[in-house]
Design a protein with these regions (language model features):
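Membrane-embedded alpha-helical segments that form the functional core of polytopic membrane enzymes
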Residues: 46-105, 122, 141
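Helix-capping/transition residues at the boundaries of transmembrane alpha-helices
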Residues: 42-44, 96-97, 208-209
Length: 244
């Protein structure tokens, strides 16, 4: 995503656009079904892709804060904000590609937003369950999840610094769903589960919130977050060894 000064071009003419996104050919991820309808409206405004990402970040953090209340109403409201956050997380890439404003910096900002919202959500959820139940174990599970997510994010950032990239475009959202060539079955299963659940995680949260069952995410995430960063490092080490 280039500097926002490029956004002074006429928005009404849209002559500089590559075009709005087309209707998704696949049902999943479900968030794409929402984003492709919202993106054309965003393209009629001066809002740039980085601003869409920033709005997604703010909505996600607010939704995470709402979860700290620990009540049924807070869970549903917080879930709706998380849903908006995830929808805009798809929109920013669509806006960037439509306007030809994709960049490495925009991709890194998007990755940061994903990490920040996910980490804040589990911290908010854990605090909320602890607040209502009085059992501190839920807070420790949230901290374990946040730790695992942060380690994995740091591993990715370290890899970005080491690896040189030839193009400056943001990775398309469809590419995020591509399955890596990993011979290890366990690593592959963890990767697929993490990637697909991440794409529509907001719907999982909303569904569980309607039944006051979001607490089940905490023990699952506390274990899964550690497994994913271990697999991520394992995958990168194997790839580095194969390139030598």
């Amino acid at each position: 995503m280039r500097d926002d000064r490029e956004q002074h071009k006429s928005i009404t003419s849209l002559s500089f656009l590559k075009g709005p996104p087309h209707r998704p050919s696949r049902l999943f991820p479900l968030t794409r079904q929402l984003s492709w309808m919202l993106t054309p409206f965003l393209l009629r405004t001066p809002i740039g892709p980085n601003q869409v990402t920033a709005l997604s970040l703010l909505l996600g953090l607010y939704g995470a804060w709402v979860f700290t209340e620990g009540t049924f109403e807070a869970g549903v409201i917080g879930s709706l904000f998380i849903l908006l956050c995830y929808t805009l997380d798809n929109c920013d890439g669509e806006v960037a590609r439509a306007r030809g404003l994709a960049s490495k910096w925009g991709a890194r900002f998007d990755d940061f937003t994903d990490w920040a919202v996910d980490t804040a959500f589990f911290l908010g959820l854990g605090f909320g369950v602890w607040n209502v139940s009085g059992e501190v174990i839920w807070w420790w599970l949230a901290l374990a999840t946040a730790f695992g997510a942060t380690v994995d994010y740091c591993v990715d950032i370290s890899a970005y610094w080491r690896e040189s990239r030839d193009d400056s475009t943001k990775v398309p959202d469809d590419a995020k769903l591509d399955r890596p060539k990993m011979p290890d079955l366990m690593a592959s299963l963890i990767y697929v589960f993490h990637t697909l659940s991440r794409a529509d995680f907001c719907f999982i949260v909303l569904g569980l919130s309607l039944f006051e069952f979001t607490w089940v995410l905490l023990p699952l995430a506390a274990v899964g977050a550690q497994a994913y960063w271990v697999v991520d490092i394992y995958k990168r080490v194997r790839r580095a060894g194969a390139n030598q």
